[in-house]
């Protein structure tokens, strides 16, 4: 099946490669736009040997995205479909060199032809009602910060069950912040999947921009703090980037619609009441600058999107999380944790979840979920590389909870550091969606090994390249190893690729 699939993919990639025109975008890369639709089977497909069976399967592949990077490599993202419906998160990526050679193929190469086993019998409205019932809510009793709480409601093919489902995304702020994906069988109304996707830790021209000073929770002087003045008030709104950065105060509510942009009568945000907001605002700008300057990424989505931070979430909440739209920070219980916005590594970690969402889109369960957590940790380190710890600054001195995670020594902080310690936990909230936080210690240790072999500067470049071009939504640890090897080879050659392999083999990923 794998060799057959590769034959098919090669044909699709080359057909696309020779029927696309190139158009440069704002960040120096090239997005390939499909200007023509092939009206007949290309000669390359007809010439394939019968053993490839390409003629039977070719029509089931759809090209989702094509990007040409600065090295001249063209990256194609393909998905299987059946009956015109795309599968959920099943992706294959094909990478073609400037001299038209396929250098790397990754993704689910074992997937065969999919046959739909059900028929559409329930309506979209019924499916939405069942989705809300499945999470113990109703559409009338939830509140969304932006627009309708029903963000997506498309029919896709669940590749595990081979059944069509309404894939419904629900994001709301009341009665609690949530970002649910619920899959409802189009025939029976059965719930085939439900998952809360929260990623946790455990402009008007007449307005003027100013620089300000502020003190964070650790009483550090954060500057420059970019603010905006409207009439007689200074607001924590940073307009110095293409993407707007805003910081809101929830005043211990959990509904983001209650959030107000933090303001002050002067540009000195030094009173303790502003400390959480100062940290959140300052570090959000630092993260923006990191991705822009180091990776040429304009904001978290690569398109200059806004970054909204909400502080004082709930009462003594020991957490921070990205909910798919914005980042929310709890104040901590003051016994074990300080306000969660005071740790630059945590801010970097949570905002990197957004970068992951807009790039590889790693599915938040099992090994792909552990990779999601790990890449957020690793980039948290890249953003604040003073030590190997994630979240140290948020911990109260003397607290037994200590540092949240260690890239260098995961096993010191209740994480696996080798595949022999890997745990296959249930894919439920109680099972931490397959142990994504526990098992992420394994790729974290592999990242530490890579950094010690290649250095931070090279490692952060190859990690970003792998995240942007080579990882797929369902990537496993072995896929990450191969993706990082290929990225290292692209940028630094065979020797660097071998060192990446050694780093992962040292944690039992062969």
Swiss-Prot record:
What cofactor(s) does the depicted protein rely on?
Zn(2+)
Keywords (alphabetical) are: Hydrolase, Metal-binding, Metalloprotease, Protease, Secreted, Signal, Zinc, Zymogen
User: Which InterPro entries does this one have?
Assistant: FTP_domain, PepSY, Peptidase_M4, Peptidase_M4/M1_CTD_sf, Peptidase_M4_C_domain, Peptidase_M4_domain, Zinc_Metalloprotease_M4
Superkingdom of origin: Bacteria
One GO CC term of this entry? extracellular region
Entry's EC annotation: 3.4.24.-
Function statement: Probably linked to the pathogenesis of listerial infection.
The identity of this protein, by name, is Zinc metalloproteinase
């Amino acid at each position: 099946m794998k060799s057959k699939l590769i034959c098919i993919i090669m044909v699709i990639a080359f057909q696309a490669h020779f029927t696309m025109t190139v158009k440069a975008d704002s960040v120096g890369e090239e997005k390939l736009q499909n200007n023509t639709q092939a009206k007949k089977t290309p000669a390359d497909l007809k010439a394939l040997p019968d053993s490839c069976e390409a003629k039977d399967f070719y029509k089931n592949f759809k090209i989702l995205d094509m990007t040409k990077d600065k090295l001249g490599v063209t990256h194609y993202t393909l998905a299987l479909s059946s009956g015109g419906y795309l599968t959920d998160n099943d992706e294959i990526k094909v990478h073609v060199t400037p001299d038209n050679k396929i250098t790397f193929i990754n993704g689910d190469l074992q997937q065969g032809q999919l046959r739909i086993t059900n028929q559409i019998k329930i309506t979209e409205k019924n499916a939405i009602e069942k989705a809300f019932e499945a999470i113990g809510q109703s559409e009338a009793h939830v509140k969304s910060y932006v627009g309708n709480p029903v963000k997506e409601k498309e029919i896709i093919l669940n590749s595990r069950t081979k059944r069509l489902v309404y894939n419904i995304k629900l994001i709301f702020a009341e009665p609690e912040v949530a970002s649910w994906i619920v899959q409802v069988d189009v025939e029976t109304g059965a719930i085939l999947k439900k998952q809360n996707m929260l990623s946790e830790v455990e402009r008007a021209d007449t307005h003027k921009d100013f620089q300000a000073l502020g003190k964070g929770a650790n009483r550090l002087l954060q500057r420059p703090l970019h603010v905006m003045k409207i009439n007689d008030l200074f607001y924590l709104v940073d307009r110095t980037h293409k993407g707007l950065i805003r910081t809101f105060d929830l005043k211990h509510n959990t509904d983001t619609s209650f959030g107000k942009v933090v303001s002050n009568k002067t540009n000195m945000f030094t009173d303790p009441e502003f400390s959480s907001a100062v940290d959140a605002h300052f570090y959000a700008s630092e993260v923006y600058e990191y991705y822009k300057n180091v990776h040429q990424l304009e904001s978290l989505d690569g398109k200059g999107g806004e970054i909204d931070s909400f502080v004082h979430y709930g009462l003594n909440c020991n957490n921070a999380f990205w909910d798919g739209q914005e980042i929310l920070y709890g104040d901590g219980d003051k016994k074990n944790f300080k306000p969660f916005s005071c740790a630059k590594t945590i801010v970097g970690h949570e905002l990197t979840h957004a970068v992951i969402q807009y790039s590889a889109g790693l599915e938040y369960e099992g090994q792909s979920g552990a990779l999601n957590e790990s890449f957020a940790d690793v980039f948290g380190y890249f953003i604040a590389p003073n030590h190997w710890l994630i979240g140290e600054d948020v911990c109260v001195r003397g607290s037994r909870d200590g540092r949240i995670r260690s890239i260098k020594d995961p096993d010191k902080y209740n994480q696996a550091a080798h595949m022999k310690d890997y745990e296959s936990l249930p894919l439920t909230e109680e099972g931490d969606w397959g142990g994504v936080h526990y098992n992420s210690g394994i790729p974290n240790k592999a990242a530490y090994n890579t950094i010690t072999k290649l250095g931070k500067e090279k490692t952060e470049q190859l990690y970003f390249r792998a995240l942007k071009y080579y990882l797929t939504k369902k990537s496993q640890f072995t896929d990450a190893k191969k993706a990082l090897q290929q990225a290292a080879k692209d940028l630094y050659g065979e020797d660097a690729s071998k060192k990446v392999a050694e780093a992962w083999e040292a944690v039992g990923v062969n």
